[in-house]
Amino acid sequence: AKFCGNQYSDREWLIAPIRDHGFLWATNAEILVCVPDDPNVSAKDGCPANLIKFHEWFKLAGNFNKINAEAIPKAKRCPSCNGSGIWPAFGDDPEETCQECNGSGEYKNQEVSVGAQHISRWYLALIASLENAQLSCSSDAPTAPMFFKFEGGWGCVMPIKPRSKS
């Protein structure tokens, strides 16, 4: 579920894993993970054709490098909740989980450079937490999906456009 959309997603089909073509797919439209099907996992049947294309593209990816988790910068605090993960009560409304960081308290759009591409620090740390995670970066297409593989599966994450340094 950590790779699926959350309850605030405007695309309901992203909230739970999807079962199709012998795989379980989980995505929030920014990151995608694919593992062999497991009948014990609750999932929706059928997935959009564009997800299947990612499997073909993954087969073309190369130059996978192990992710050095210790080299990932420390997370900055989410500016929306000041790192608490909670939006405070306002008027008669109760406290609720911060929609920006999904309760983690971490700034999700903190930019990290990986070769010629840039990725959200939050996603890089999430990928690095997977067993034997390796990342493939494109040196000539900075906005191309970044593919990764790990023990038992593979995935891709969309890079972020570098912010101008002014």
Task: Please provide the spans of the model-predicted regions.
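Intrinsically disordered, low-complexity linker/loop segments enriched in Gly/Pro
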Residues: 1-35
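C-terminal functional regions that serve as terminal interaction/effector modules
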Residues: 27-166
